[in-house]
Curated annotation (Swiss-Prot):
This is Superoxide dismutase [Mn], mitochondrial. The lineage of its organism: Eukaryota, Metazoa, Chordata, Craniata, Vertebrata. Homotetramer. One of its GO terms (molecular function) is superoxide dismutase activity. Nitrated under oxidative stress. Nitration coupled with oxidation inhibits the catalytic activity.
Length: 222
């Protein structure tokens, strides 16, 4: 199911605005590992706060915003609908991004990808090390809060690395299909790495779930 769903994460989590009247409420996804499972690279306190507080807040605020949007839609209040767009983008993006992020991590992660994903990385970036350096640099260079992404350009059939500010969702803002996201909001690392974002970015490669990233890539190739 993951393979079929990987390319449509954004579309499933944030329905078309016109269909909000019959929507189901969003819920916080369970993690497939314990909060302490990613130590020593990401400690349990960060994981617990990040998942149960920060991600949960995006989910709750998204549901509240969609309820308000539904009311505005029913009333034909276009002004209110427009005013709610930033909150839909921010909280919807936060939910989409984190739902992908948790699956991109694994206590059994690290190393290098295999098979067709590795071949594509070498084709589009020259080598795995060059890819790793570029995604690290792009993520480190995000001003303020945001994400570094490895995405798939379906039109060109190639991998691309980009940064998105705040919680802007990759597919909704660039058209790229998200494969691997690195959260560089301070809540993702500050309690452990303080203001040294590069140390966090160096550590996170040890828990990247390449199996999940590969599944997402193969799903997008179909």
């Amino acid at each position: 199911m993951l393979c079929r769903a990987a390319c449509s994460t954004s579309r499933k989590l944030v329905p078309a605005l016109g269909s909000l009247g019959s929507r189901q409420k969003h819920s916080l996804p369970d993690l497939q590992y314990d909060y302490g499972a990613l130590e020593p690279y990401i400690n349990a306190q960060i994981m617990q706060l990040h998942h149960s507080k920060h991600h949960a807040a995006y989910v709750n605020n998204l549901n509240v915003t969609e309820e308000k949007y539904q009311e505005a839609l029913a009333k034909g209040d276009v002004t209110a609908q427009i005013a709610l767009q930033p909150a839909l983008k921010f909280n919807g993006g936060g939910h989409i991004n984190h739902t992908i992020f948790w699956t991109n991590l694994s206590p059994n992660g690290g190393g290098e990808p295999k098979g067709k994903l590795l071949d594509a990385i070498k084709r589009d970036f020259g080598s795995f090390d060059k890819f790793k350096e570029k995604l690290t640099a792009v993520s480190a260079g995000v001003q303020g809060s945001g994400w570094g992404w490895l995405g798939f350009n379906k039109d060109q059939g190639r991998l691309q690395i980009v940064a998105c500010p705040n919680q802007d969702p990759l597919q909704g803002t660039t058209g790229l299909i998200p494969l691997l996201g690195i959260d560089v909001w301070e809540h993702a690392y500050y309690l452990q790495y303080k203001n040294v974002r590069p140390d966090y970015l160096k550590a996170i490669w040890n828990v990247i779930n390449w199996e999940n990233v590969s599944e997402r890539y193969m799903a997008c190739k179909k």
